[in-house]
Amino acid sequence: MFEKNMKLAYLLDFYIDLFDDHTAAVTRAYYEDDLSLAEIAAGEGISRQGVRHIIKKCGEHILFLEEKLGLAGLQSAKNDALEELESIRSTLPFEVGEKIDVVITKLKGV
């Protein structure tokens, strides 16, 4: 359960803007602010069951989006490739290293 919550908290950064403001606020309060269902319910003026339903449905949609789009997976692969480039850079001649620095800077901006 904890592992799934950590994964969803990470995936929020990639997909939360695709949801309406209310769903995003409830889901962020749960995963990012670590509020209880009761605390969120009181703040949003809905029942705890309503909060649970929103969080469950939003989580399912986020996992579906990641399965289909793979944005978090792509970001992870990009970061791994950048780390590998940075480690290789130091073993190359200075001129080549400078060119690789330009590529790394461009990739970090994407």
Where are each of the predicted segments found?
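Residues within the DNA-recognition helix of helix-turn-helix
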Residues: 54-57
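Hydrophobic positions on the alpha-helical face of helix-turn-helix-like DNA-binding modules
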Residues: 26, 40-41, 51
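Generic L/I/V-rich hydrophobic alpha-helical segments across diverse proteins
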Residues: 82-85, 97-100, 104-107
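Short, Lys/Arg-enriched N-terminal segment that forms or immediately precedes the first helix
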Residues: 3-15
